[in-house]
Regions:
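Short, structured motif recognition centered on aromatic/hydrophobic residues
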Residues: 118, 205-212, 274-281
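Phosphate-rich cofactor/ligand-interacting catalytic cores and adjacent structured alpha/beta frameworks
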Residues: 1-82, 88-89, 126-259, 263, ...
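Short, electropositive, low-hydrophobicity segments enriched in small/polar residues
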Residues: 118, 124, 182, 273-274
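Short glycine/serine- and small hydrophobic-enriched flexible loop segments
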Residues: 120-128, 279-286
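Short, hydrophobic/aliphatic alpha-helical segments
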Residues: 91-107, 250-264, 282
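Long, hydrophobic/aromatic-enriched structural stretches that serve as scaffold segments
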Residues: 71-126
Length: 305
């Protein structure tokens, strides 16, 4: 049974009233809202470290705070430089500095490398202030991503190793394509669940599961291979078809998936990064300068109540 998603609606241009610092803070809040969202199968949340042995909720918060100034620097560059290869080179250099700051804040753990790429591009594009519609920001971010980075390190990253073995394009391919899993999965799902009067927590969990069900997550492929990816995609789909977050059957299916991912040491980190991107673009479209964390007041129990 296919899960039908609404088509992303077209809206008039939205002009920016936020400066680079405010956009960077919104990106930080998106990262914090993602990690605070509970319960997430295999991921760090308020229950614990998920499938990670080197991360925690506090470390994820610290990482988000450490990289926020670099998002602001990217935005400042976008406002002062032409939108061309020079900016691409500058933003890439800032991104590598952000990775160093992240590693220092987390004692060497990779908390947000993918998010630095994803949200860095989106903050840079949004800082132009031309149009804050999600599709327009994603289009500009994709244009920038596709420009060559002359200083790109020659060492293979985990994502590049996975791409070579499985053909999955990962965060780089997502950006090149204009963030389709954000525009056509995350955002429409979040809107649809709000229209169904879901709690904000459940709406965000629905968005995450829909992304997990479709994304060729290179974080999953690196840890669990093709079999692990199939488990994640089927498990997320099964949870949605069972009723999703907000239903006893759906939450029990999420629990089963969570337990399976912990056993296999699999964490869908790529999907988590795209959920954060979803929350960031959603806030911009809604004209919000803050992303509320509803996790403490809207806890999902995995159907145990």
């Amino acid at each position: 049974m296919a899960i039908v998603l609404p088509i992303l609606r077209q809206v008039a241009p939205i002009r920016s009233v936020l400066d680079a610092g405010q956009l960077a803070e919104l990106a930080r809040q998106a990262l914090v809202a993602e990690v605070e969202l509970t319960p997430k199968p295999g991921l760090v949340d308020r229950r614990g470290a998920g499938a990670h042995s080197d991360l925690s909720l506090d470390l994820m918060r610290q990482s988000a705070a450490a990289i926020a100034p670099y998002f602001e620097a990217m935005g400042d560059s976008a406002q002062s430089m032409p939108f061309d290869r020079g900016l691409r080179t500058e933003v890439a250099a800032i991104g590598r500095a952000a990775e160093s700051a992240m590693l220092q804040a987390t004692n060497g753990s990779n908390a947000h490398k993918g998010a630095i790429w994803v949200l860095g591009l989106l903050v840079t594009a949004a800082s132009r202030g031309i149009d804050l519609n999600p599709a327009a920001i994603a289009q500009d971010a994709a244009f920038l991503a596709r420009l060559p980075d002359r200083a790109q390190p020659q060492l293979l990253s985990h994502g590049e190793m996975v791409r070579a073995r499985y053909g999955a394009t990962g965060a780089r391919g997502e950006a090149f394509a204009g963030f389709p899993h954000v525009l056509h999965v995350g955002l429409p799902t979040l809107r649809a669940e709000r229209n169904r009067a879901r709690t904000e927590t459940n709406g965000r969990l629905w968005a995450l599961l829909n992304i997990m069900a479709r994304l060729e997550d290179t974080c999953v492929l690196y840890r669990g291979g093709a079999e692990g990816l199939a488990i994640v995609q089927k498990g997320a789909s099964d949870a949605l078809l069972a009723g999703g977050p907000g239903s006893v059957a759906g939450e029990l299916a999420m629990l089963r998936l969570d337990q399976e991912l912990l056993i296999r040491n699999i964490s869908p980190g790529g999907a988590a990064d795209l959920l954060a991107a979803t929350l960031f673009l959603d806030a911009l479209e809604q004209g919000q300068n803050a992303i509320e964390d509803n996790s403490l007041s809207e806890e999902v129990s995995y159907g145990t109540d």
